[in-house]
Amino acid sequence: MGAAGVLIGQGFDAHRFAPAGSGRELWIAGLYWPVPDSCSEADAARYEGIEGDSDGDVAAHALIDALLAAARLGDIGSLFGVGADAHGAGRHGIDMLQEVVAHLASNGYTPASASVAIIGNRPKIGTRRAEAEAALSAAVGCPVSVTATTTDHMGFTGRGEGIAAIANALVEKI
């Protein structure tokens, strides 16, 4: 551990978009992304949700892994399980983040700072960046910055098949 008792962790998550008509809601960075009123029926499919056991919120999930990694407490799968019957099944990323913060506290750690980079063509994160930062910061209890990028049409995110996120987090021993 560093002299100041600050530890860093990194997390990553990626999910495929659900097929059109699946009824899955699109949740990213703790926010629901509804189909815009001005959206054509053909474009509405681009707001289909993300496949996953929970809400598929890649930003929240990457942040969970970063926080747990920093405290050396495992990862999202070790805390919430995997599969339809797991502890995390059907849950929202924000709820899971709040549980992780409580788990950190019970193990003597507190979040100090975090950053999440969302990788994908859609939705356009910049339009709601401040809202996303506020939602994640409130859930974690420390400042969380949110950035977004594309892969210039390369790979599964570039082809619009899915979305990914990378997060870094600092935790302090309390």
UniProtKB/Swiss-Prot annotation:
UniProt xrefs under InterPro entries: MECDP_synthase, MECDP_synthase_CS, MECDP_synthase_sf
Cofactor(s) essential for the protein: a divalent metal cation
Keyword Lyase tagged: yes
Residues binding a divalent metal cation: 13, 15, 61
Binding-site list for 4-CDP-2-C-methyl-D-erythritol 2-phosphate: 13-15, 75-77, 149-152, 156, 159
The protein's Enzyme Commission number: 4.6.1.12
GO biological process: isopentenyl diphosphate biosynthetic process, methylerythritol 4-phosphate pathway; terpenoid biosynthetic process
UniProt remark on cofactor binding: Binds 1 divalent metal cation per subunit.
Alphabetized UniProt keyword annotations: Isoprene biosynthesis, Lyase, Metal-binding
Residues the UniProt record annotates as site (Transition state stabilizer): 53, 150
Reaction(s) the record says it catalyses: 4-CDP-2-C-methyl-D-erythritol 2-phosphate = 2-C-methyl-D-erythritol 2,4-cyclic diphosphate + CMP
Biochemical pathway: Isoprenoid biosynthesis; isopentenyl diphosphate biosynthesis via DXP pathway; isopentenyl diphosphate from 1-deoxy-D-xylulose 5-phosphate: step 4/6
Gene Ontology molecular functions: 2-C-methyl-D-erythritol 2,4-cyclodiphosphate synthase activity; metal ion binding
Gene3D superfamilies assigned to the protein according to its UniProt record, in alphabetical order: 2-C-methyl-D-erythritol 2,4-cyclodiphosphate synthase (3.30.1330.50)
Role summary: Involved in the biosynthesis of isopentenyl diphosphate (IPP) and dimethylallyl diphosphate (DMAPP), two major building blocks of isoprenoid compounds. Catalyzes the conversion of 4-diphosphocytidyl-2-C-methyl-D-erythritol 2-phosphate (CDP-ME2P) to 2-C-methyl-D-erythritol 2,4-cyclodiphosphate (ME-CPP) with a corresponding release of cytidine 5-monophosphate (CMP).
Quaternary data: Homotrimer.
Similarity section: Belongs to the IspF family.
UniProt-recorded name of the protein: 2-C-methyl-D-erythritol 2,4-cyclodiphosphate synthase
Gene name in the database record: ispF
